[in-house]
Amino acid sequence: MPAARAAVTQTAGRVPLGLANGGDEVLIVVPWDADRVVQEAIARAYAERRVKAHVQYEHDLAGVSNADMAAISKAESLMQIGDGQQELNFFFELTGQVANPEAGREWIRQRDPDLFNATWPKARYSAQLEKISNGYAKAVEKALQKYLTDNPRISKVYMGLGARNKTRRILGDHADKFFGSYTYNNHFDLSSKVPEFPGDVWRLVETKTIEALAFADRLEVSDPEGTAIAADLTPEVAQAWAKGVYQQGHLYMFPSQATGRWPYSLIRYPAYDNDKGFLAPLLVEATGVIASTNSHRATHPRLEMHLDKGRVTKVVGGGWYGEGFRRLLDYPGTKDLTWPFFDRPGYWWLYEAGTATNPKYFKHPAEMLTQVPPRELLRGGNLSERNVAGVIHWAVGTEAEHGPEVAGKPSPKSIDFGKKYNVPIGHAMHQHNLLPTYQVRIRGTGQWQTLIEHGNLAALSDPEVRALAARYGDPDEILRKDFVHPIPGITIPGKYDSYGMNPGEWWKRWAGEIARGTSPYMK
């Protein structure tokens, strides 16, 4: 219960359950296999604050039995953590938002049957279960909206592990009730020190990290796995970036993602800052290489994504993920079409540098050992590590997440464009840099400011941040990073080349040792 009590008072980050006030009713939506003990603890902790929590399981909303969900999950769980091609799903679903994903996947099947079969293996189950699976997401969405209509006193909704702007759309006319993600499906985040990390300290860490961006004329990012990119910034780009960079727990540390949207308010989350207005999307000409062995969905053999003046020019390595990435570079329209609100053609522009800000998150070992159905893009996989402070997750795309018409909503022009050409109107092809160094040069001074060094947020050592943290206890303990990725040849003894050829096996072994209690890092 102490951890649950801390969780329901946390006001910062992805899961700000503490934004609910006494007398409120909130809705928490969890997957069918969420830990019921954890959910009961959260509901009881809320009740102590005089907040009524409606905890709804997705399958109950959709009218599907637990047994059917277990059978579907077993049939569809055909992938391991090392099957990096799972990340290709994001091009078509969720973040990529292709209007007709089946037609897009068929384009791959016709050109590369082996890649198609490796990425979308056929599940073996009855026609009845297949029908349930195919209609499950829509059934949950419809039932969720009805539940909110039938329970008008609910003022706040928490659900999903990420993609907050897209998750809120699932609520339809109730979208403004969406207040955050929900990562307490099991005990991992709840048993960490994330819930008790002081919310005002968390926000100060974030504002310290972004305060120099408006004055930057160049950014440079490197990483020991091989990333090295740079981009020059005009004053106009820097100003727009600074206006749109903020989102609790997920900073938009590349100007392209910070624009093409109505920015979040720094003080009234999750409200949008209407005073800043719609920020027209920008394309920034970054040049260099992004190298990785991890993505949102899985791990992959070391991959290099080469950039020239903002565009992807070449993909090297990466196993099946790299093979699929190279194939998709020729997807119809992605080189020659010009997306709505953009001034240059093409889809394959660097878009995202999502940056985590809490030093108490850690990589969940269970993700490395649990098979997850490929359609469940935001359940498990390899998502938890992107929440570790200092980790950057990159993605590409020509995305205007919102339109200028209505705050927080995509433009009908973007939606119609996507339907007309069956191209993604979002972002895709995530890559994680686990130990990046991120610097910006201050305009007119020649001085560089380091925002992240070898995966450590510089703001965690800032005197003002430490002074504020001292109000809650020992600042060394409060601000200490609890998890550093153990990468052979970089942070622990071993050969990186061997790791880079098959990182999935390394991470499975790492997780297995933790599960058995034999890990040298758990003494």
Where are these regions (language model features)?
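Short C-terminal domain-edge/linker segments immediately following a structured domain
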Residues: Y57-L61, D189-S192, Y321-E323, D336-L337, ...
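Dual-mode signal for accessory low-complexity, basic/Gly-rich regions
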Residues: A298-T299, K314-E405, Y438-V440, D474-P486, ...
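A hydrophobic, small-residue-rich beta->alpha segment in the mid-to-C-terminal subdomain
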Residues: Y321, V388-I392, G397-D474
